[in-house]
Structure formats: structure tokens, C-alpha cells
Amino acid sequence: MKTVLAIFSSLNGTEGNSSKLANEYLLKIENDDSVRINRVDVASLALPHLTGEEMQAWMTDASERNESQHALAKISDNIVEAVKAADEIVLAVPMYNFGIPSSLKAYFDRIARAGITFKYTETGPVGLLENKSATVFAARGGVYAGSDFDTQTPYLKHFLNFIGISDVNFVYAEGLNMGEEQANSAFADANEKIIELTKG
């Protein structure tokens, strides 16, 4: 059984363009009896920004945590458990002010745990989440891929690589606010990429 963790982050929910792209991909694989899909909408989760108190809860031995620390550590523990259980991570990512949504960053902050999802060595950090892949569906109002304005792609690649996920595919739909013709063309190109990714 292949487990897919689909992470959505659009403020527009299922109507968001990144959500539509990711759902098109999931639609093509969900009828396979060997695939199980778990969905999470980080925009609706409304995770708070990471605090020193929460990080301290992680670093406190479980046997020594107080009630508040147990509750704080559980937030990250549940997220990490879902990521560890997945064979593929699907990310639906809109571009907000040239970056990823803050809700997604808050989610990522609960994934990066020293000794759990990565470790430090004499030669640098090593990711611990091996044998996983990620597929990113990036929707943008303008055209930014390959330019300095695209901070998403390098950040997402670096973060995923950092925790051990090096098999990463990107599907872009750009220029969605630059007229109907451009938007239709962008979606058509993205759908072709989706078909390629779901073949066989």
C-alpha cells in the first residue's frame, strides 16, 4: 500500500488554483486500490508561529514534560508521524508575496526536528526521511520560475532535501492573473505534466 500525504495551503481552499492542480493529480491516482491518500489543509489548521516554549517542549525528555509541554510536543509529533507514514508528499502551494504561505511554513517548522527527521554529523546535517518522494503543485499569478522572484522553488527543494527527500517534482501553473488565454495555456501545460507523472 502506497500512502500519499497531500498538504494544501491555499487561503481559497479547494477553489485555490494550487488545490485544483493537486486534486487533478490525486484524482488520477486515488482509484488505485494500492494507494491511500491522507489530506491536510494547513490553512484551516491555523497553526501558530513556532515559539521557544514549544521548541523547549520537544527538547525536554518525554518523561519529564509537564502537561503543557506534552500538549505542545504532541502538535509536532502528530505532524511528523503523518509525514513518516507517507511514501509521497503532495504539496499544493500558492505564491503569496513571492513566498510560501505562512501556514505552510508553520507546518514545516513542526517537521524539522533534530534527531527525528534530520541529524547533525561532522560533515553537516543528514536527512532521516529516506525512500520518499514529493510532488509540488505551484500556482502563481505571474511568471516567476527561473527568476530571482521565485523563492519558493529553491526553498522547497532545500527543505525537502534537508529532511531526506531528494526525489522532488515540480508542476507549475504561472501567469494565471495575466489574462484568460495565458491562464488556460498554463493549466493545459500543467495537466500535461500531471499526465506524464501518473503514467504507468
UniProtKB/Swiss-Prot annotation:
Family annotation (InterPro entries): Flavodoxin_fold, Flavoprotein-like_sf, FMN-dep_NADH:Q_OxRdtase_AzoR1, NADH:quinone_OxRdtase_FMN_depd
Regions annotated as coiled coil: none
Record keywords: Flavoprotein, FMN, NAD, Oxidoreductase
Cofactor, how bound (note): Binds 1 FMN per subunit.
Top-level EC class: oxidoreductase
Record field: catalytic activity: 2 a quinone + NADH + H(+) = 2 a 1,4-benzosemiquinone + NAD(+); N,N-dimethyl-1,4-phenylenediamine + anthranilate + 2 NAD(+) = 2-(4-dimethylaminophenyl)diazenylbenzoate + 2 NADH + 2 H(+)
EC number: 1.6.5.-, 1.7.1.17
UniProt-annotated binding residues for FMN: 10, 95-98
Essential cofactor(s): FMN
A molecular function (GO) term: electron transfer activity
Similarity-based family: Belongs to the azoreductase type 1 family.
HAMAP family: Azoreductase_type1
Record's subunit section: Homodimer.
Function per UniProt: Quinone reductase that provides resistance to thiol-specific stress caused by electrophilic quinones. Also exhibits azoreductase activity. Catalyzes the reductive cleavage of the azo bond in aromatic azo compounds to the corresponding amines.
UniProt protein name: FMN-dependent NADH:quinone oxidoreductase
Organism this protein belongs to: Alteromonas mediterranea (strain DSM 17117 / CIP 110805 / LMG 28347 / Deep ecotype)
Species classification: Bacteria, Pseudomonadati, Pseudomonadota, Gammaproteobacteria, Alteromonadales
Gene behind this protein: azoR
